[in-house]
Amino acid sequence: MLLNGDCSENLKKEEGTSEPPRENGLDEGEPGDETTGQEVIVIQDTGFSVKILAPGIEPFSLQVSPQEMVQEIHQVLMDREDTCHRTCFSLHLDGNMLDHFSELRSVEGLQEGSVLRVVEEPYTVREARIHVRHVRDLLKSLDPSDAFNGVDCNSLSFLSVFTDGDLGDSGKRKKGLEMDPIDCTPPEYILPGSRERPLCPLQPQNRDWKPLQCLKVLTMSGWNPPPGNRKMHGDLMYLFVITAEDRQVSITASTRGFYLNQSTAYHFNPKPASPRFLSHSLVELLNQISPTFKKNFAVLQKKRVQRHPFERIATPFQVYSWTAPQAEHAMDCVRAEDAYTSRLGYEEHIPGQTRDWNEELQTTRELPRKNLPERLLRERAIFKVHSDFTAAATRGAMAVIDGNVMAINPSEETKMQMFIWNNIFFSLGFDVRDHYKDFGGDVAAYVAPTNDLNGVRTYNAVDVEGLYTLGTVVVDYRGYRVTAQSIIPGILERDQEQSVIYGSIDFGKTVVSHPRYLELLERTSRPLKILRHRVLNDRDEEVELCSSVECKGIIGNDGRHYILDLLRTFPPDLNFLPVPGEELPEECSRAGFPRTHRHKLCCLRQELVDAFVEHRYLLFMKLAALQLMQQKASKVETTTSLENGGLPSSAETKSEDSIGPEAGCEEEGSSVSGLAKVKELAETIASDDGTVDPRSREVIRNACKAVGSISSTAFDIRFNPDIFSPGVRFPESCQDEVRDQKQLLKDAAAFLLSCQIPGLVKDCTEYAVLPMDGATLAEVMRQRGINMRYLGKVLDLVLRSPARDQLDHIYKIGIGELITRSAKHIFKTYLQGVELSGLSAAISHFLNCFLSSYPNPVAHLPADELLSKKRNKRRKNRPPGAADNTAWAVMTPQELWKNICHEAKNYFDFTLECDSVDQAVETYGLQKITLLREISLKTGIQILLKEYSFDSRHKPAFTEEDVLNIFPVVKHVNPKASDAFHFFQSGQAKVQQGFLKEGCELINEALNLFNNVYGAMHVEICACLRLLARLHYIMGDYAEALSNQQKAVLMSERVMGIEHPNTIQEYMHLALYCFASSQLSTALSLLYRARYLMLLVFGEDHPEMALLDNNIGLVLHGVMEYDLSLRFLENALAVTTKYHGPKALKVALSHHLVARVYESKAEFRSALQHEKEGYTIYKTQLGEDHEKTKESSEYLKCLTQQAVALQRTMNEIYRNGSSANIPPLKFTAPSMTSVLEQLNVINGILFIPLSQKDLENLKAEVARRHQLQEANRNRDKAEEQPMAPEPEPEPERAVEDMGSPQTAKEGPSSLNLQG
């Protein structure tokens, strides 16, 4: 049992500062979240077991939990091997039928040992359809085609290929230490230095995918639906089946079950055929008529249940694969039916026809949230309806672009058309009625939906009761952007002018306000840092707003208050919005800003606003502390300086104007004394009785004024989002406020350039963050509030950095990202001019121009373009993609690359030094396969899995047949499990303080809550499992570590992608736990897989590759593959030296690992040479007396003795020839324990078997050293890396030296203590 919120409270108490007044900032709980009360949670109700009696099988026991629903037992039975063929049944307890949707704890008389009877129910058409669909799913359960096709939330996983199935108990039966040498040899393309980057190993063939054919055909019969007279006999529908033995049969699905009828393909005869066998289950009927079906279906189900559940559970959002093998297209009745209906008749358990998405989305928000069980129920409902809405919206958007949905305004031009499908409203990203004329036209219309989505995301997170947003999904597909929104009840019957009662429909000319909206939005203004302000409307009346003018308030027919058009929720980014007569701070003009962007909707990110406010808060504390100290020191001086309105001169007088955005940037948190001042200030301001003395009040007033706070009694920074909006006017009386707000915006723009971008580069230099591909680089930038349009500036700073070599990987990733983003911008407009019939030809031509060395690829026009001269004239109502345009076919590689360079300069302000792909590869060290992956992921292209000869100058790399599909790229809201997240963070904090057991309990609790809200599959659950696995490993429970990490790998593959950098990390962790569990060949397979993926995603030269190669080298050393081991360890040494410098402790460790292998090979001279290098580094860095230096010195002596002994023996042989009588030399094969110790060291895991008291002393000592270091070196890394707000913990870094004082600051989890 835990007290909710207790941990975070304790953490704050431990820090022990009572802070001065602060009205906003980052340390608030989730607004609108009433979790602060001490409330007791009891999540784990004890489970109990019930007995299940099903027809035709032995009774069996089932473990259930009281908060499960009866429906969940249904699901379990539909999944079990022996009952999976039943779908239409009810459960009875003592003769009473149980309600599907009731919780087990509410069922009277249900207890330990109760007997539940499975009773077959009569079918309806809907139940018969569900049954056929379920049988089809069982037949296809091992077939990966749905995952390759991106259907029904299926996605790929390949872990089982490398682990030979499950790692649990079966792992113990595998070869342990008897190693088959073949297992150790990596494929040639994985070895260090290999230039080959094959694509096929990305998706290895899984032997379970060789389909066992149970039936040749199972499809709906052409005789459907049954005629009236047959309906009255109970016929529901007819099926047509061809068995594996080539027998054709027609089957009737009736209310009582399934039986054969006498119909043929051309003759309808519904009478029962022989054998006259009526079965409630279609599977039982097919078992009767086909021996092959009976045999193969049983084998199939056995294999299905042996697979790990995580390989088959649906993911919450669809994940698409950018490559797929050539698949045969098989007949599939369910797929065919899905394609031509919208599944409206039988959406899962939804009564009526289509779902009312808006009502569902808003009702779930209205659920109660006073205590934890209520909040869990609410968050689960919100998450479920969001993932369903996203799936439906994606499907609808594709149908709209493919031309399969009728427009609601069909007579208008295609760009202006709007659509409604399945109760969702769809609009295209074009500037329809010159709405965005002043903001950038179509370009602004393309950007506005994502800005709006960010606004929806933010308001949803603040979660104010009574304020509603629309369900919003933005879909990019075939070059078009489609916005899908839920529909406000009644909005289609009224004019927009009548509906809008708050905000403006014409960007600020006419503006209205409403007291209820002001009241609701006021509650969001603090967490969102939005200033309540007044503007003038077209009649020069003052109107009060608490949002940007574009934000509209509409009361729906359901009485709810909706806000929409949230595209300016955050303040404008002045670096990309030149305003005549406005000067930007020097930091901006030095960097070449302001720059004219192609639209005027550039906003600062929420993360930037939060970081800026946090930075200003620290500055506020420092200024106030400084004044207070000087008040104490000299009252006279202080009085004078305060009267002059300045600050005391001891730390360079800074007046209000000179508080630049970068003030305090470098010094932030740079000394222990700074924090002490802040604490002292807090204590001084808040005296015992809670009053504030007048002098302190004066101090606060001055500090508030200096940092731009809107209040003079407390720190409170907010932004006016309408500042610099074209067309928005402010009253005369607000001029001072407007001037201050303009200055604040300028400071924020400069803060981004002077603090955030250098901070990012610094973090990259110190390897606090390790992006591996474009997506992870973008994520790292966005976490710091840096928009992608600043990518060119980031790269400029990297180029000018003194640590340029240490940032080689960042530069390479950044250039690749810049090129592929520029190519994506061009591809978008390129695709809009392509007819559906020319899509694969156009995409393959684009890829050839982009990536192939073939100098002049020729586009293959669709055949009808060449033949048909008489094109029909009916072209008005064509789908958006149906332009009569073959302009795409004339593009050349030279032209495309010229455009890419132009786009890079224009958009990112970066000059690319290349005019072809080969030049780009050569100049920047890029890989074509990596560029192919990046462009495919960004645009939704799926290509054939095969080896492409990019470098051939005789034929183009891609043909039409190589482009298999184009998928949508979907942006949507990600609802959060807030309570689970708080537990996860508290658990992380406990672990970092060394309290492993308490941390483990909190993380376990978080896992339960995450599962409760998200179901079994989610990115955040993946992070949770990884941390749990590591904790269990440190605490010595290898089996549990293995089980959790296996789940983490499977989940990462399924929800993030099989080659996502996170998946690569997970593979490495799993390999370590496998090695510790003596599964050596599996450990190597996993490490080889990780290395292959890293080579594909980035290439050879990444700091993380050093860690990976050290792992591989150590394992190979352990299995006595010394030559192979050296190849990897020496590569790791080279990479470590490059990125950390030749004198780093990590390099010393690397030398030591290489020396050990040479010792095992009895090549003592090389071993000595490497160990000497290591010894020199230890001696220089740590001094003679450090334990590491001594260890190295001892090892050197030992090596010298062995070398002398060997030399003596050799001399003996030379002297006496073969008759010499010499004792055999002892070569030491490394023990598994010593290898594991070294593996733990390089992976940043430290075991300290100490008593509790020793542990406490050690913690105190570590803390003391840490503080000393901060004070002495002014290089406190720990403070500059606060715990990330994301649930994803940073990848743990390897620790170079366990005994060194550097250890404690090496990375987030580098120091793990075990009691």
Curated annotation (Swiss-Prot):
It holds the Pfam family TPR_12. TPR repeats lie at residues 980-1013, 1022-1055, 1106-1139, 1148-1181. Residues 335-577 form the Clu domain. SUPFAM superfamilies: Hypothetical protein c14orf129, hspc210 (SSF103107), TPR-like (SSF48452). Residues 1-35, 638-672, 1268-1315 are annotated as: Disordered. Keywords: Cytoplasm, Phosphoprotein, Repeat, TPR repeat. Residues 9-25, 1268-1280 have a biased composition (Basic and acidic residues). The keyword Cytoplasm applies. The keyword Cytoplasm applies. The modification Phosphoserine is found at S279, S281, S655, S725. Belongs to the CLU family. This is Clustered mitochondria protein homolog. It comes from Mus musculus. The gene is Cluh.
